[in-house]
Regions:
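Extracytoplasmic/secreted envelope proteins and their assembly/folding machinery
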Residues: 41-44, 51-59, 94, 98, ...
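Extracytoplasmic ligand-binding site segments that recognize negatively charged/polar headgroups
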Residues: 113-116, 132-145, 180-204, 250
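Alpha-helical, coiled-coil/dimerization segments enriched in small aliphatic residues
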Residues: 72-74, 195-225
Length: 308
């Protein structure tokens, strides 16, 4: 369906040229995370944001949102908006989105469906910016672009640079502690097939843990990225096991509980000493955005005890 609509829009764009692009001086031109040049109008009044985490970031920058996805409302970022997807943004109603004529669309560069939507939106002459926010540095970069579009530089200072200083202090405090905590970070699904360890290369929490001075056993045991090898985990015997869930949260928790009840797993140091922790979803499954310092402080306390 998207492909058919895209072909029609490409024909239309050939006939209409680039008249819909913001003239020089009336918008901010930048390169998005798909490597494409975007010209976003300054202070747009009708904006669509297609994931809840990006909606949170746009609101933090001082923007307003008229069109979004159901998860944005479920997480309490907005009370009401026109929805083009009832869930998390994986099945966007592209025809309705285009019909609404937003001045700017902000979408995920990570979701294949949204990348296709972005292509169709560009063909329709609608400015669209695709972003990938995996680390605090990504957050700062995207926040800066958003505050430039919205002409709210003070938001970048209070919700960006001020947070950087807090995080730098937390990292310095953690690095000054004695010892190197050895951890296993797991993204848990409903069964062994969907439960795997993660590293700094493929999960932002592992980037944070590394910055705080922790040693992730999966970094030296890539077999854990394919599944939780009991033999490898026993050999490494981590000080702590941290996990988040994917998909059905209750099923992920139930699977981890059943795994940790196994006598072999319960014999691990982390199990014996009560250092198995499910990380809060709002900080470690979704991106924490303006709560990055809170997320770093939470991990620091798990690794070392109370923060300074």
């Amino acid at each position: 369906m998207i492909r058919k609509l895209l072909c029609a829009l490409l024909c239309l764009s050939f006939l209409t040229g680039c008249a819909s692009l913001a003239p020089a001086g009336e918008g901010l031109t930048f390169t998005d995370d798909l490597g494409l040049e975007v010209t976003a109008p300054y202070s747009p009044e009708k904006v669509a944001v297609l994931t809840s985490s990006l909606a949170d970031l746009w609101l933090t920058a001082g923007g307003s949102i008229q069109i979004t996805v159901g998860e944005t409302l479920e997480r309490g970022f907005l009370e009401d908006a026109l929805l083009v997807d009832a869930g998390a943004g994986k099945t966007v109603d592209l025809e309705r989105l285009i019909a609404e004529g937003p001045e700017l669309v902000v979408c995920s560069a990570e979701l294949a469906g949204q990348r296709e939507c972005a292509e169709a939106l560009r063909a329709a002459g609608i400015p669209v910016a695709a972003f990938s926010v995996e680390t605090f540095e990504d957050y700062l970069r995207v926040l800066k672009i958003c505050t430039q579009i919205l002409k709210t530089p003070e938001k970048y200072e209070t919700c960006g640079e001020a947070l950087r200083l807090e995080i730098e202090e937390l990292i310095a405090d953690a690095r000054a502690r004695e010892g190197t905590p050895r951890i296993l970070f797991v993204r848990a699904g409903s069964s062994a097939r969907y439960t795997k360890a993660k590293t700094a290369e493929n999960h932002f929490v592992c980037v944070m843990l590394a910055a705080l001075g922790a040693e992730n056993i999966a970094e030296k045991a890539p077999v854990l990225l394919e599944g939780l090898s009991t033999e490898e985990v026993l050999l490494s015997d981590p000080d702590a096991i941290l996990f988040t869930t994917m998909g059905d949260e209750a099923a992920g928790i139930a699977y981890m509980e059943s795994l940790l009840e196994d006598p072999v797993w319960s014999s691990l140091r982390a199990g014996r000493e009560g250092n198995v922790h499910q990380l809060p979803k709002d900080l470690f499954q979704y991106k924490p955005n303006s709560r990055w310092p809170e997320a770093y402080a939470y991990l620091t306390e798990l690794l070392y005890g109370e923060t300074a």
